[in-house]
Each structure stands twice: as C-alpha cells, then as structure tokens.
From Swiss-Prot:
Pfam families: UPF0236 (PF06782). InterPro entries: UPF0236. This is UPF0236 protein TTE0033/TTE0744/TTE0838/TTE0852/TTE1082/TTE1247/TTE1519/TTE1678/TTE1739/TTE1823/TTE2212. Belongs to the UPF0236 family.
Length: 467
C-alpha cells in the first residue's frame, strides 16, 4: 500500500467504499434491517473511509515537505517513524519523517508540527473536546463511550478536563450597560468527596430581572459564576469586579442579593454597594412548614403576618405554637424556625416594601447547574475534579464553546517549523486533480460501458469532477 502514490490510495479507498456500500444495500434487500442498524453500518463505513483519507493526506503532506528545497536547506532527514492517534473517527496510523535542524540541532516531525500534533499526543483535540463536553452532563465512563469508537479510560477523561483547566466565558464588553436594577442570586450545594468528607461549591448568578421568551419567564442577561474553596470575601470581590466591568455603576439604583440567609451570602452586603438582602421564599416556606407540621392551621396566620410585614404578629403566632407544643423536640423545631425567620426579617419584609423585588430562584438553579451532575456521583469527587467540573458547568451555562478555548499551558517549541507556500499548495492541488482524472479515465469498468452501481458512481465522479 505504501508504495502507491497519494492519488492511487484515495481512489482505491473510494472504490472499496463503493463496493462496501453495495454490500450493505444487498444485505438490506436480502435480510432486512431497521433504520438504526442501517445508520450504524453506514457510519462504520464512512468512519473507515475518513480514517483512510486522513492517513493518506498526512503521508502525502509529509512527502511534499520532504521534497521541498526550503526544507532541505534547514532540516536533515533522520528516519521515518509510525504514529498512532485516536480521532473522533477512530484510531489512525501513519508514517512521518523525523528531522534534525541544521541551525540548532533540535529534532522534530515537521508534518506533525504543520498539523499541530503534539510530540507525545495520543488523542487529538476533537476527541478531548467531545470527552469534556460529554463529561459536563454525564459520568466519565459514559463520556468516554460516546466520544469515539475506541475504548478510552476514565482517567483519560479526567486528564482532558485537567488540560483545559478552569475555564470561564469572558464577555466582550464594547460599552458598559446602563440598568436601574440588578439582581444577584446565590446558593451552595453539598457534594461528597472521595476521602469521606464533603465540599460546598457555591453558585452565584447575576441578571437584570425576568423577561418572557417563548411563553415562559427567563432571566435577562444572566451570567453564572462557580466557586469551590474560595473565601466569602474573595467571592464577593470577584462579583463586584464583574459588575464594575460590565455595568455603569453610577446608573444602578438598587442591587438585590437573594439567597437562604447563610453568612457567606449576607457578606455580599459589605462588598456590593447599593445592595439589599432578599430571603429566598423556598427556604422561608421550608421553615414555616417545619414550625407548623403539628399545627397546619397556623400556616395561613404566619403567612398573613409575613406578607403584611407584621413582625410582632409573627412573634405572637410563634409564641402560641411553642406554648401548645406537647414535646420538647417539637418546641425546639418551632424555636429554630422562629430564629431563622426573625434573623432574616429584613430580607422578608422587603417583599411588601419594594416593588422591584422579584424573589429568588437559586434553589432550582443550584439543582440544575450543580446537583444534576455534582451531588449524584456515588463514588464522590476529588477536590480538583469537583472544582474543574463546577467551572465547566457554569462555562456551559454561559454559552461557552470549548473549541474557542486555548487548551493546556505547554507551548510547542516547534510550532511554525514548516509552512507550505501558496505556490506549493497550487502545484500539489493541480497535480492531484490531473492525475486522479487520468486514473478515473483509465479504469476498466468505465471503458467497458457496462452499467453497474460502481460504474454509476465513478461516472458521476468523472464528469462532476468531485475528486
């Protein structure tokens, strides 16, 4: 196979593909198959054709480089080596030439440099992107099964995630926005770790209120941020910086920080100017239910007092509940709910005082953004893996594209070692087209004139000049 030139290989692969397609069609007619089986068979053939084409193209490019006069002036041929690379089409294997620089004595494979294939790279970037994209939604094991036909370990998935690192969508800011009101919502998840302990990744998202899209309410210009292991003050400094970078702060009249009342959330009031706290109604309702589990008739009374901003009325109702509770355990539950509500009273009464307050959806977001992936891993996470995945989840929510991210921190010292000239490109394309058309004209099956499936395909190639 290796002794044939590029055009022969490409044409032979096309002929083989045509024959194999005819075999599939014959099998369909004789034995029958459903659409899923048919798609799988065809995909297997097209993937195989793609792998063979890539191998042939790389080896042809290697030959062009080897014969180039400019190359001979700067690089000395050492030997030929094989390389195996996993791609989204499956494994490819090709031979390429190893060179030594006449200038500084360094060694490299020029064709690999031209195609940005790393010296020790065994998996191409397209596969890594698929591995990470899949891992954002599914387990490492399922991610590896879907990325490409070859078997890939869970460790390889983690390595791909490590290589991309902590990613973040940086919005292009042409001009700072003017808004009157800004909303910040915050919550945390509880995630088990492999060492038996747990971690609390924190989610913050900033938006400009709600708007209707396609018949449902969505958050306007929402931007998500994830934090794992950071101190509260560092989190809020980062949020403050985001606001400063994206909005004209002098035009903002109000900023609402909504959440469950945890100290780290309320600390945001110290860092975000013009901010007021809003208690998440989900957690408020949870404590109302907790206090009235034995006396549900008191629920409406508590909610009436809350909605009217009647703090004294709330105290009085809780006093009655504590008084009629029969067990000490029940009394403690009621007292705990009372403390929670009174400690967060400013974030409760704001609902009745300020028409711009829209409530908080953090509980639903923490479930969708974090819990759906992070807290449902029965084996637990490593701290590193958890942090990287939390960042990836919000990267995805913010509309990030892994193809636009600069992967890894290592630089290829041989990048740019060789680049084809425009003249070389034109000459190579002209030669391949001319040679291929000549070979198609000389194919026996075309000259005989007998109409067969292969004849139809080759005739179409010949006159449409597809190749």
């Amino acid at each position: 196979m290796k002794k044939h030139i590029f055009e022969d290989i490409i044409l032979q692969n096309a002929l083989n593909f045509t024959r194999e397609m005819m075999n599939v069609f014959e099998d369909l007619l004789k034995n029958g198959m459903n659409i899923t089986e048919l798609v799988a068979r065809i995909k297997e053939l097209t993937d195989k054709l793609g792998r063979e084409a890539i191998e042939a193209i790389i080896e042809e490019l290697d030959r062009i480089i080897k014969e180039d006069k400019r190359r001979k002036e700067k690089w000395v041929v050492e030997r030929k080596d094989k390389k195996r690379l996993t791609t989204v089409l499956g494994d490819i294997e090709y031979e390429r030439t190893y060179y030594k620089s006449r200038e500084d004595g360094r060694y490299t494979y020029l064709v690999d440099d031209a195609l940005e294939i790393g010296r020790h790279e065994r998996i191409e970037k397209g596969v890594k992107i698929k591995l990470v994209e899949n891992a954002i939604e599914e387990s490492y094991e399922k991610s590896s099964e879907k990325a490409c036909p070859e078997k890939i370990s869970k460790q390889t998935v983690l390595n791909a995630i490590r290589e991309i690192g902590e990613v973040e969508v940086k919005r292009e800011i042409k001009e700072k926005k003017e808004v009157r009101v800004l909303y910040i919502e915050a919550d945390e998840d509880h995630v088990p770790l492999q060492d038996g302990s747990s971690e609390t990744p924190r989610l913050i998202y900033i938006h400009e209120g709600r708007e209707e899209k396609n018949g449902r309410n969505v958050l306007k210009n929402v931007y998500y941020k994830a934090y794992v292991g950071e101190k509260a003050e560092d989190i809020w400094i980062d949020v403050a910086n985001y606001i400063e970078e994206n909005y004209k702060e002098e035009k903002i009249e109000k900023i609402y920080i909504a959440g469950d009342g945890a100290p780290w959330i309320k600390e945001g009031l110290e860092w975000i100017v013009k901010s007021r706290f809003v208690l998440d109604r989900y957690h408020l309702n949870k404590y109302v239910l907790k206090a009235t589990s034995k006396e549900p008739k008191y629920r409406d009374k508590i909610w009436r007092a809350i909605n009217e901003g009647d703090k004294e009325g709330v105290k009085k109702i809780f006093g009655e509940l504590i008084k009629i509770a029969k067990e000490e355990k029940e009394k403690e539950k009621i007292k705990e709910a009372k403390r929670y509500i009174l400690n967060n009273w400013e974030g409760i009464k704001i609902y009745s005082e300020d028409e711009d307050v829209i409530g908080c959806s953090a509980e639903g977001h923490i479930s969708h953004v974090f819990s759906a992936r992070l807290s449902r891993n029965p084996l637990g996470w490593s701290r590193e893996g958890l942090k990287l995945m939390a960042k990836l989840r919000v990267f995805s929510k913010n509309g990030g594209d892994l193809r636009e991210v600069e992967w890894g921190k290592k630089k290829n010292i041989n990048a740019g070692s060789y680049k084809l000239t425009e003249k070389q490109i034109k000459e190579a394309v002209r030669r391949v087209k001319t040679s291929t058309n000549e070979k198609i004209n000389n194919i026996t099956v075309l000259n005989i004139g007998k109409v067969t499936p292969i004849y139809r395909v080759l005739r179409a190639l010949k006159y449409a000049q597809v190749i």
